[in-house]
C-alpha cells in the first residue's frame, strides 16, 4: 500500500510550466521571476519539481503561464522531439564554480527548457486572457497539460 502511494507521488512531483503570454507591460518582479524560471519567451516550457519554492514562483506568475503534472510519456516525447543538447560551460575557468543549467537524461546533457510551437487548434475558447476554468489558457490545468504539450510539440 505504501509503495503504491509513493510511486503515485513520484509521478506527480514533476510539473510542466508553459509561458502563454508575452513580454509587454510586465512588472519588474514578474520579469525577474520569469528570469529565475528561465522562461524568456512565449511558448517556452520548463519541467520542474513540485517544491514549495518553485510552486511559489509559479503562483506569482500565474496570470502569464499555465502548468500541470506532466506524464512520463509526454516528457519522453518532448525530450525526443524538442530537447536541445546543452553546449555551454560545465565549469568556470578556474574550476571554482560548476554550472547546473542542464539536466542529465540517459547520459546526455539537455537544456532545462523546451522551445515549443504554438498549439494546434489554439489554447481554448476564450484565448490567453482567461483562466483554464473559465475556458481560457491560464493557470493550473492538472493532467490536461499533457494534451496541450502534445499539440505544441
Annotate each language-model stretch with its function.
Residues 1-153:
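Core subunits and conserved enzymes of cellular information-processing
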Amino acid at each position: 500500500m505504501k509503495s503504491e502511494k509513493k510511486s503515485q507521488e513520484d509521478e506527480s512531483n514533476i510539473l510542466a510550466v508553459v509561458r502563454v503570454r508575452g513580454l509587454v507591460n510586465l512588472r519588474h518582479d514578474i520579469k525577474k521571476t520569469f528570469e529565475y524560471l528561465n522562461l524568456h519567451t512565449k511558448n517556452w516550457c520548463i519541467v520542474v519539481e513540485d517544491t514549495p519554492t518553485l510552486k511559489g514562483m509559479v503562483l506569482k506568475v500565474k496570470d502569464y503561464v499555465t502548468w500541470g503534472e506532466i506524464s512520463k510519456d509526454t516528457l519522453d516525447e518532448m525530450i525526443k522531439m524538442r530537447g536541445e543538447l546543452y553546449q555551454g560551460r560545465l565549469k568556470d575557468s578556474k574550476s571554482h564554480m560548476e554550472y547546473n543549467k542542464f539536466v542529465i537524461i540517459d547520459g546526455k546533457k539537455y537544456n532545462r527548457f523546451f522551445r515549443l510551437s504554438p498549439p494546434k487548434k489554439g489554447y481554448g475558447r476564450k484565448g490567453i486572457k482567461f483562466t483554464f476554468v473559465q475556458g481560457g489558457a491560464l493557470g493550473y490545468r492538472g493532467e490536461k497539460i499533457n494534451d496541450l504539450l502534445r499539440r505544441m510539440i
